[in-house]
Design a protein with these regions (language model features):
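GHKL-family ATPase ATP-binding module
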Residues: 1-262
Length: 262
């Protein structure tokens, strides 16, 4: 809402509707009505999602192309702490992770996101090696496994410890352990039962890894050419593409014409 330094408070229906929709997604089966009865702005919405955060992921991916059917869902509890996760891969090149603690959005992430990312990378790496989907020379990083990922993480705990006044980041270290354990166990079970999905995820991560490596080499090549392309360097002295010093030689010549075409 906004008052703009006046005595009249103006509510933005779209902002309220978006927040209420999040609440409906995060609390499966909860029905929320939003109604605007202001003259000329009449509208209402009725929201109830039996699938909870699974439907949240489907809604977020409504304009994207998933690379596998269905949303991967997992949940677990330790003591008074509860965590549930839902995610799906698409053919996009960006990642979208939305995390919540006690229904409060944590845009800067925190321990729940850290636990998820660590477990996702280690579990997929182990699965890829075990199923011979990864070779010895393949180096896949966490960012490669998260390319095209849409994920919702929701945790509920009695003593949430937020960092900063805006509650943008969750600091409970025990939540990292809980989420990591859930993902490690449940994702491994899912991959064993759904090998086609596992292969699709690994194939996408491998493609992302190779693209990242190609981009890195291209940047290094441009930097080398830029460093050696100054006015002080003669045109005949070209950059060397070989990075192994055992396979290269250095020729030192004197004068502008002494080297010829060397």
């Amino acid at each position: 809402c906004s008052s703009d330094l006046t005595d009249t408070t103006v509510y933005d229906y779209d902002i309220l509707h978006t927040r209420m929709r999040e609440e409906a997604f995060l609390n499966a089966g909860l029905r929320i009505h939003t109604i605007d009865q202001r003259a000329g702005r009449e509208q209402h919405d009725d929201m109830c999602y039996a699938g909870g955060i699974r439907e949240f992921v489907t809604w977020l991916n409504r304009a994207k192309n998933p690379i596998h059917d269905g949303v991967i869902y997992m949940a677990g509890q330790k003591g008074d702490s509860i965590a549930e996760l839902a995610f799906q891969y698409t053919d996009s090149y960006s990642e979208s992770i939305l995390s919540f603690a006690n229904n409060v959005h944590t845009p800067e992430g925190g321990m729940h996101e850290t636990g998820f990312k660590q477990a996702l990378t280690s579990t997929l790496n182990a699965y890829g090696r075990r199923m011979n989907l990864l070779k010895d020379g393949d180096e896949i990083k966490g960012e490669d496994y998260r390319e095209g990922l849409t994920c919702i993480i929701s945790v509920k705990l009695t003593d949430a410890q937020f960092e900063g006044q805006t509650k943008a980041k969750l600091g409970n270290s025990e939540v990292r352990t809980l989420v990591s354990a859930i993902v490690s166990e449940k994702l491994e079970e899912f991959l064993e039962e759904n090998p086609a999905v596992g292969r699709a995820i690994l194939d996408k991560a491998l493609t992302a890894s190779r693209a990242r490596e190609a981009a890195r080499k291209a940047r290094e090549s441009i930097r080398r050419k830029t460093a050696l392309g100054g006015a002080a360097m003669p045109d005949k002295l070209r950059d060397c593409n070989e990075v192994n010093p055992e396979l290269t030689e250095l020729y030192i010549v004197e004068g502008d014409s002494a080297g010829g075409s060397a």
